[in-house]
Amino acid sequence: MKSNQERSNECLPPKKREIPATSRPSEEKATALPSDNHCVEGVAWLPSTPGSRGHGGGRHGPAGTSGEHGLQGMGLHKALSAGLDYSPPSAPRSVPTANTLPTVYPPPQSGTPVSPVQYAHLSHTFQFIGSSQYSGPYAGFIPSQLISPPGNPVTSAVASAAGATTPSQRSQLEAYSTLLANMGSLSQAPGHKVEPPPQQHLGRAAGLVNPGSPPPTQQNQYIHISSSPQSSGRATSPPIPVHLHPHQTMIPHTLTLGPSSQVVVQYSDAGGHFVPRESTKKAESSRLQQAMQAKEVLNGEMEKSRRYGASSSVELSLGKTSSKSVPHPYESRHVVVHPSPADYSSRDTSGVRGSVMVLPNSSTPSADLETQQATHREASPSTLNDKSGLHLGKPGHRSYALSPHTVIQTTHSASEPLPVGLPATAFYAGAQPPVIGYLSSQQQAITYAGGLPQHLVIPGTQPLLIPVGSPDMDTPGAASAIVTSSPQFAAVPHTFVTTALPKSENFNPEALVTQAAYPAMVQAQIHLPVVQSVASPAAASPTLPPYFMKGSIIQLANGELKKVEDLKTEDFIQSAEISNDLKIDSSTVERIEDSHSPGVAVIQFAVGEHRAQVSVEVLVEYPFFVFGQGWSSCCPERTSQLFDLPCSKLSVGDVCISLTLKNLKNGSVKKGQPVDPASALLKHAKTDSLAGSRHRYAEQENGINQGSAQVLSENGELKFPEKIGLPAAPFLTKIEPSKPTATRKRRWSAPETRKLEKSEDEPPLTLPKPSLIPQEVKICIEGRSNVGK
């Protein structure tokens, strides 16, 4: 055994080593495992041993192939006696590199000047963690310490990482990563027990780091893995929602690691720039203990989200790019572990939650994305040894189509509920814009809608809820689910959401590629379908606002509270007299006809003193307040059935009354709207000083529009006539040449004498519009009751 001093000296860069260069190779070979002699064979390592995927032994067992055996011996059974000394080609080297293991890692690229790899002794506690302060050889490799190396010595990931490309394209960085993966598995911080998780992929595809390739425009990818500080022996891994964020600087580079609830894997493009190892040595050692702790916490957690840019099977990785390197959305990367105690752990009831933030490289070609998409799948337990996919500890699949503008797709087990609707701050440590998407298949803990088992939430001032499937959905084809209309979609033009399998069952990875949605995701040119209006769904099943419901409380202008069914004509008149802002508008029913649509009637009103003719389509059950008679509707039976509101039959000659604002401008109401005081109130309510009345009015407008999709909105305003005030939302107003008259009607605000006459068509719904208590009375008349609600 070497002395501690010798070992520490060997860990130093060549320039600072005190050991004679000639003594190192023989001594090092002497101390290496008997299988070390096989390392020479590791040159051909993975390219020549595609079948070694499932044979590589873990840190606790013998190796299957000689090349892997040699690595195993170096990394598992001795104190990291073999390490890579990576320094720029121009840096002088005090130790002859060719004498150590000349055939193991010769410079693979003849055209690119890269320094050869040599071994250096590293301490047991050495743990490699990429840091933002350095790039190059240490960039882009997640140490097996964090990865929780599998029971088999050498993962197929290592094979694919180093052997996927031909020697002409494989950089020393790749060779370094493969060796590092094995070396990292041997060192464990004392006191931390680590149980070997299921086999996992190194997460690095062939040609990922090509020194000669230009860095992508978007260089940072973030994988945010959230887990609770539980033992590493967790039987099953939690589901992983995926979050996509377009910003590179979302996560700070300098973060500390510890047994926290969150781990962030940050990928930074090194651009093939290599720096001397000594400049990064201290940073690595300082993070060693933290990395060890993270491993215990994460164990299998990180593995499941680290399958990016890697082929699902070794053959696929080894077989492709034999003559050319494949561009990837992820170039050389840095690993940063970031604890966020305030993250999921505080919100998750189940204790362990995994989340993934992915920042795709916008420069990645769609062809490569297709390859990744086809290969980024989780292998089922039966194929775990054959495919180097990630395994969540339970059957299922997760596919990442990481195109430049693509929102993720993920699978969650129904047995592990995942909270929905969490704010963007739950996932991001910095004050960055909200995540683009949050996908969950949770069926219970849904705060937005109890019936949505799986949906996409786009956080923002008004969170956007996008249903993306149902619990029994077997295919991600339902990705193009209905999306609630929201202006936020303007900011997410290139987003395509695909649903995932919520079931806990084996998923055939091949089925994914066949789905039509996936090619679309790869292209990243698909826009989320946006429903034209929230009222559209309502159109199918129109419903009236609840204020017409019997028992709803209406507040009159004088402050008196009355039930909607107890309103009298005097209440309207008194409210108009007491209030300086309200007046009674009347509309006379001139004609009632059946509409071509079932359950809809066409009513023609003569509005105001000018008798402006307005035709309105209204639901037959919509109640109007008739002067001297009370509530009336075209179909009293339906009204009584729906609202339990006693109604009379609306007939020609009836004068419908409603309270409207006196100060409404002539042009404030649109075509046909002037006739409807309710619509006038609605418009005014928007600008009215009274929040309560405004709220009621808004409710009326929304309820009407949504309840009966028949109402058309023009420039955001309801088209139904004012007289119908209450029914306005349910009606579709057909404006006749009497528009000017309608405008005049607004001018009527002065003539209070006609209040009774005008009251024909104006429903009490207009009342809620006014901000004053009289407006509330109006609401009462219209049937809209805040108190009732």
UniProtKB/Swiss-Prot annotation:
Query: Post-translation: what modifications?
Result: Ubiquitinated by UBE3A, leading to its degradation by the proteasome.
Q: Where is this region: Disordered?
A: 1-73, 188-237, 296-397, 736-772
Mind telling me where the Glycyl lysine isopeptide (Lys-Gly) (interchain with G-Cter in SUMO) cross-link is?
16, 193, 583, 670, 719
Q: Does the keyword Ubl conjugation apply?
A: yes
Q: Which Pfam families match?
A: ATXN-1_C (PF12547), AXH (PF08517)
Residues that bear Phosphothreonine: 217
Highest taxon of source:
Eukaryota
User: Which keywords does UniProt give here?
Assistant: Cytoplasm, DNA-binding, Isopeptide bond, Nucleus, Phosphoprotein, Repressor, RNA-binding, Transcription, Transcription regulation, Ubl conjugation
Question: An example Gene Ontology cellular component term from the record?
Answer: postsynapse
Q: Where is the stretch described as RNA-binding?
A: 514-740
Instruction: Give start-end positions of Basic and acidic residues composition bias.
Output: 1-30
Positions occupied by motif Nuclear localization signal: 768-771
- What's a GO biological-process term for it? positive regulation of glial cell proliferation
**Chain positions covered by the region annotation Self-association:** 468-578
- Please give the residue positions where the record annotates the modification Phosphoserine: 81, 87, 213, 228, 749
Extract one GO molecular function annotation from the record.
poly(G) binding
Q: What is its main location?
A: cytoplasm
UniProt xrefs under InterPro entries = Ataxin-1_N (IPR020997), ATAXIN1-like (IPR043404), Ataxin_AXH_dom (IPR003652), Ataxin_AXH_dom_sf (IPR036096)
Q: Does the keyword Zinc-finger apply?
A: no
The record's similarity note reads: Belongs to the ATXN1 family.
Q: What is known of its domains?
A: The AXH domain is required for interaction with CIC.
Name by which UniProt lists this protein: Ataxin-1
Q: Which organism is it from?
A: Rattus norvegicus (Rat)
